Regions:
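RNase H-like (RuvC/DEDD) metal-dependent nuclease/polynucleotide-processing core
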Residues: 2-188
Length: 188
C-alpha cells in the first residue's frame, strides 16, 4: 500500500522512480490518489507511528525500527533473478497467457508453478514456511487462489523487511515516500 509522510493526493516521486526504472520490466506502479489509498494510508502511517514505527523514507539513516513500503513485483525480480514481471496474480491470468488461449485449468497450473517458484525462493531466505500451495487437483476456481497469492505477497514483504534490516535495500523516492527494493536490482 502506498504510504507517505504527508497525505497522498497524486503520483509521488517514489512511484515515478519505480515506474521509470522497472516499467520496462513489466513492473510500473499505479498512480495513487486522495481516494486510493486515501485515508487508509494516513491511518496506517499514524497507527504505526503511535507504536513507535515511523515511516522510513530515503532522506535519512534509519536507526530505529520503522515502517517501510515495498512492491512485491519488483522484489520478485531479485528474489527469482527474473528479467521480467513474474506472472503470479490470479486476476491477471487471462492476460498473461492470452495468446496461448489457455483453459482455466491450464492457467491454474501455470499460476501454481509460479507460486511454487516464489515459495522456493523465499524458502532460501526464511526458514519454517509451511507448505500451503495446493496441488492442481485441489483447485477448482481461479478465485480460490487469491488467499494463496495474498500469503505469498505477505511473505515477499517480510523478505524485503529482512533485507532492509540487513541493510540490503535501497529506497527509491524522496523525503516524503520511498519504495524499498533489493539493492541487487540497483547495484548488481
Amino acid at each position: 500500500m502506498p504510504v507517505a509522510t504527508t497525505p497522498i493526493t497524486s503520483r509521488r516521486a517514489a512511484d515515478t522512480a519505480i515506474s521509470s526504472r522497472f516499467g520496462p520490466r513489466g513492473c510500473a506502479v499505479h498512480s495513487p490518489s486522495a481516494e486510493r489509498p486515501g485515508a487508509i494510508a494516513d491511518q496506517l502511517r499514524a497507527d504505526f507511528a503511535a507504536l513507535g514505527y515511523s515511516l522510513h523514507t530515503n532522506d535519512r539513516e534509519q536507526t530505529t525500527p520503522a515502517l517501510i513500503e515495498c512492491y512485491p513485483h519488483v522484489a520478485l525480480l531479485a528474489l527469482l533473478k527474473r528479467d521480467y514481471r513474474v506472472p503470479y496474480k490470479m486476476s491477471r491470468s487471462g492476460q498473461y497467457w492470452k495468446a496461448e488461449k489457455l483453459t482455466r485449468s491450464e492457467r491454474i497450473k501455470r499460476l501454481l508453478e509460479q507460486f511454487r517458484a516464489i515459495k522456493a525462493g523465499l524458502d532460501l531466505h526464511i526458514s519454517g514456511i509451511p507448505e500451503f500451495i495446493p496441488k492442481p487437483s485441489e483447485v477448482t476456481t481461479l478465485t480460490s487462489l487469491k488467499p494463496v497469492e495474498d500469503m505469498l505477497d505477505g511473505l515477499i514483504c517480510a523478505w524485503i523487511g529482512i533485507e532492509h534490516i540487513e541493510g540490503r535495500t535501497i529506497g527509491l523516492g524522496n523525503h516524503t515516500a520511498a519504495i524499498w527494493v533489493p539493492e541487487t536490482l540497483i547495484n548488481p
